[in-house]
Amino acid sequence: MTIPKSSTGQSYPPVLDYRIVQLIGGGGFSKVFRAVNPSSESHSVAAIKVISYAPNRSNKYPIDRRALQKEVQVHSILKHPNVLEFLGAVERGVDKNGNAGKEKGILMGEAVATTKESIRARDKERQQMLSSPSHDQNYVPGLYMVLELGAGGDLFDKIAPDYGVEEDLAHFYFQQLLAGLEYIHSQGVTHRDIKPENMLLDAEGNLKIADFGLCSVYKYKGKERELTGACGSLPYIAPEMNGKPYRGEPVDVWSSGVVLFAMLVGSTPWDEPTSRSPEYSAYRTGKLFEYDPWPRIPQDALSLLKKMMHPTPEKRITFEGIRRHRWFKRANDLMTQKGKCNDPVNLAEKLLQGLAVSGDIIVEVNGAAAAAARRLDLHSDGQRAQVPENVSLTQPDAILTSSFDLAARAVARGWADDTGPGGGLPLPSSTAMPAFASDDMSRRLAMSQHISSRRAEFSTTASGSGYDMALPGASQFTQALNHFTQFEALTHVAGTGSSHLRFSPHLTRFFSSASAATILALIIDVLDRLAVLNAHQAIGDQEELELEEAYNFMADGEPETTVPSDDSSRPTGGSKRLLIGSRGARIRLKTMDRRKCVLRGEVYVENLAAPDSTSDSASAPDRNAAKCLVVMKKGKGDPLEWRRLFREVCRRPEIMQTIIST
């Protein structure tokens, strides 16, 4: 595999014996890559976070070198099962004195290593630098942090928006979140950016707290200092972060309370904790508890949430108080005595069942499960039953309108030209909404049952054809996620294209019976209708699927028009010239979510069909044959909001009718 290069022709170097192989996220100053080190006994696959020191037109503010230095110093000393492990850090393309036109580094030329393996690699690289001082002159200048890979992906990628997860799952992950936070604070550190985007899963489904870029040391040798400066994401920050001094523990307690709320109901309670938010104002008066989704929250959990999100920090519950709360102390069959997942396959099954019942994933249903679904759908006279959608009765009709449309959004949220019963409190923005309007509840239940029925197959299938447990990062949890949702027709396209996308922790994906060209055109049309900035590029045989220059490594501006990447690119018709390569295409997109936060990522349309069948036939397409795979990969933003955008794409009738499985 070719080592990727930046738009300046500079390359990304080996880092502490790790070789960069795949871009997996990021934006602005930083990008995150997957990296491999086959000789490592503990982490053969890792993540490398690269913070560029190179000037870029899209970077409006200079890099905060002191903050970077603090992030490395703090994260490198944190060792806990629920904290993403820091393996090491090096700088490349820099000079500790700023000589030779290079940027001045923050590590003063010295690599940071925290494990025996990374220490050995650091010493080896040090010898190489002594023997060849100019060996890194053509590397992308920046800080390279080697981190544990969150092989299970984002936790909230597996939680249905406006639905949430069952109480035991929320309790399991909240216990792990609190364990990690208690440890962090025991070291005198406050995270200050607890949100879904910074909650990853390891290969066994356990939670890992990530990203210490906004952390601060607030306690040292028993002495505590107050902090200043608002930071984090508005829906999750504490109300006292308003420019005045605040304490370190209460702000993380508040943010973890909002995260718990989001796990239970699939939405944040407000846009921001200020008087500008009608929801937060209603929360302070107590009126908000009358409206969905608050009544859906179990009473003990609600009791804890109220204590964690008390507007007055002095009256807010502490971490110690949370641990004594009756909801926190409830038994949980998913967890070992040491606080880890005791059955990764069961955990994957429960997460997927929630997505199936909410309608956020589509699973190919056949055999007994399909027959059961048909029986549920029919009355005794053989006529189809009218199965109502599981929607709040207070939800306005506008829910079927695009949630990304600004005009419709105000009405759908209930804050424009709509009020609650009797002209009272407007409808909360987090009221429930159906995922796929054309789907019915009986089929959703059948899909959930089908996921359970496939568990018996997993132990034998996982080691058989199509499931390589020896793949880097493969585990029972990650393989179960794919096995339970995989459709049988996939075996007909095995070996075509690049399979690493098919077997990944990303659940914002679907297999389609339409051609890649058709789906590409439809997705771009949906994004245009939603006013989502987007640009696409063809992917050809001569390119690595996720590493070619089209990423414009440090570009964080608006998506730009791209050119064909090879001779296989061709227009697909329509008003806009669409580019589709022999392997498919990639769409880069950027928008603002409904909480006014940046949402950025890419959509991959991978061609699975034979070379001579890349377009839709005039005859009826084979409904069971997958012609393309679509994967939406979030780069930056709230995972719940990313899944909402995925939902919007899938709702398009022309796309929905081609979806075989997700």
From Swiss-Prot:
Residues 18-328 form the Protein kinase domain. Its main location: nucleus. It catalyses: L-seryl-[protein] + ATP = O-phospho-L-seryl-[protein] + ADP + H(+); L-threonyl-[protein] + ATP = O-phospho-L-threonyl-[protein] + ADP + H(+). One of its GO terms (biological process) is mitotic G2 DNA damage checkpoint signaling. This is Serine/threonine-protein kinase CHK1. Transmembrane segments: none annotated. PANTHER family: CALCIUM/CALMODULIN-DEPENDENT PROTEIN KINASE KINASE-RELATED, SERINE_THREONINE-PROTEIN KINASE CHK1. Its EC number is 2.7.11.1.
